[in-house]
Amino acid sequence: MNMNDKPIFTGCGTAMVTPFKNGEVDFDAFSELVRRQLEAGMHFLVPLATTGETPCLENDEKLQLLVRCREIVDDYEQRTGRSVPVVVGAGTNSLRQTVRNMDFFSPHGADAFLVVVPYYNKPTQKGQYEYFKAVAEATDKPVIIYNVPGRTGANMEASTCIRLAQDVPNIVGIKEASGKFSQIADIIAGVPKSFSVLSGDDDITMSMMNAGASGVISVASNAIPELMVEFVEALGAPQVCGADFVSAPDMAKSAELFYRLRPFFSACFVESNPIPVKAALALMGLIHNELRLPLVPCSANTENLMREVLGKLGYLK
């Protein structure tokens, strides 16, 4: 376990989308999205995960995206003195492939890895424990578990997460998207204070952080980074990853922001992520509304809903 008394990964991290143009990765648009996140004060970035449509990317595309992200973050850190970790999605349902991914990304600027509970295979709790232990032993970088049973078909139980947090030094956090609040509360109560429990669902971030979670890996922040940073900081997250915590949460402000943002949170999941948030970014003129099959652009109803909620938040001219 991390021997510090504060978690390493805290606040708001954006699960970055991957823009496409005419079927190819739009690296220029991606670069602008990264810059926009940094200027909004985002605490950390998460490229090449679910929201980035990573299963549909070629290895050379993944590498170019990471290198672009790293170069822009390095330049920002040099100019501002503010550290913004880059957490790279590397997980698969094969131990060997996950290790190959980590080896592939490690020399190119990954500060940590987000590793999903293996999908399709439906491993037991013992299998999950042994898998993540082996993953962590294969790298010297921090590893964050990603528990999202709605996509993987396998749920990591609280007891398994707690064992990993206690037994494996560089497993430093979990992105929890099970939607099982009693399980999440058990994790928060059972892991060391140095372990990051991060919401994987924007809509329950306030509930999780009020119960002691460290922050969120957000989809919504792709489109509304300034408001998400403000919201998470009002909940009492550190203003910068690894910095001192704010003195006290501003409960009135966080509640006001939650109810203001909640329609957008809901809109981001009326269709499979990242379909709606890509529609939002396209409406804002930041990307082309393209995805790679088997994902397709949103329905007209979803686009109209996004136009409505973004307009109310002041993000459309």
PLM features per residue range, with description:
Residues 30, 62, 66, 98, ...:
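A general structural signal for well-ordered alpha-helical segments in protein cores
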Residues 8-19, 36, 40-42, 51, ...:
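C-terminal alpha-helical cap/extension of soluble enzyme domains
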Residues 137-138, 151-269:
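Catalytic alpha/beta core domains of metabolic enzymes, predominantly
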Residues 94, 201-202, 299:
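Helix N-cap/beta->alpha junction signal
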Residues 72-83, 108-109, 139-141, 167-170, ...:
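Short helix-capping segments at alpha-helix termini
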Residues 147-148, 170-171, 292-293:
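Glycine-rich phosphate-binding "P-loop"
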Residues 2-14, 18-153, 163:
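Active-site beta->alpha loop and helix N-cap motifs at the rims of alpha/beta catalytic domains
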